[in-house]
Amino acid sequence: MRAPLLLESRDYLLSEQMPVAVTNRYPQETFVEHTHQFCEIVIVWRGNGLHVLNDHPYRITCGDVFYIQAADHHSYESVHDLVLDNIIYCPERLHLNAQWHKLLPPLGPEQNQGYWRLTTQGMAQARPIIQQLAQESRKTDSWSIQLTEVLLLQLAIVLKRHRYRAEQAHLLPDGEQLDLIMSALQQSLGAYFDMANFCHKNQLVERSLKQLFRQQTGMSISHYLRQIRLCHAKCLLRGSEHRISDIAARCGFEDSNYFSAVFTREAGMTPRDYRQRFIRSPVLPTKNEP
């Protein structure tokens, strides 16, 4: 298997002293699997796409945040009007006496520890910081170099305060409409999602919520739910021995034949063929071995 493309620091940071850079992806195009000489924070503002991080697929959209380590490998596929910012940084170039280890990964051994959601309020606070950070990181004087690190610290604190796990939005004190619906959808991977009941419970207008969701993500609510269910199915096909019919049920598909048809249409291969890609072939002995 060919090694992933390596993105080098010198192609993104103006000098060997500059610790931070911002690359605006307006829009983010399909990008092959790659790794880096630096770390990055990815914040999605609009649209949607498939983000494959360390072989784990995520259907990403407005408000998704990823902390990417240098050794991680990831790619972007099936993008639709995907708008995001990459905040690139080199940990070894950070000199402020800050508790970076509590603000930036590694945060723990969990596979999805680098994936978070950002509240609507958090997005509003983060955006002007990123804009200023982008301006300062294009300069090479010593004051700008120091200011970029200060701005990165400010951004890291804002993200720490306003990030949450997708399935825990209901714990937020002031849940915004988009945060609430995202949480509910994440908790409905294997069960029926009752839109009318959700809106009644949270005192929301169904039509307005659907319009807001499509405006921010570029998808309907039902399409997004189907996409995250398919991403969950891919994870189960790769990492479990469950029967395909059981996986279909775990991902909200009552009919396994319908699941196979939808999966094949979206992935370009059947669930069985997809699973076969990740089954290692046994090593056969050579002729000289007993």
Curated annotation (Swiss-Prot):
Xref: InterPro entries: AraC-bd, Homeodomain-like_sf, HTH_AraC, HTH_AraC-typ_CS, RhaR_RhaS-like_N, RmlC-like_jellyroll, RmlC_Cupin_sf, Tscrpt_act_RhaR
DNA-binding region: 196-217, 244-267
UniProt keyword Methyltransferase, yes or no: no
Keywords in alphabetical order: Activator, Cytoplasm, DNA-binding, Repeat, Rhamnose metabolism, Transcription, Transcription regulation
Domain of life: Bacteria
Principal location: cytoplasm
GO cellular component: cytoplasm
Record GO terms (molecular function): DNA-binding transcription factor activity; sequence-specific DNA binding
Gene Ontology biological-process annotations: positive regulation of DNA-templated transcription; rhamnose metabolic process
Cystine residue pairs: none
Boundaries of every HTH araC/xylS-type domain copy: 179-277
Subcellular localization(s) per the UniProt record: Cytoplasm
Keyword Acyltransferase attributed: no
Site location (Interaction with sigma-70): D246
Signal peptide range: none
UniProt cross-references to Pfam families, sorted A to Z: AraC_binding, HTH_18
Subunit structure, interactors included: Binds DNA as a dimer.
Protein function: Activates expression of the rhaSR operon in response to L-rhamnose.
Name this polypeptide is given: HTH-type transcriptional activator RhaR
Species whose genome carries this gene: Yersinia pseudotuberculosis serotype O:3 (strain YPIII)
Gene: rhaR
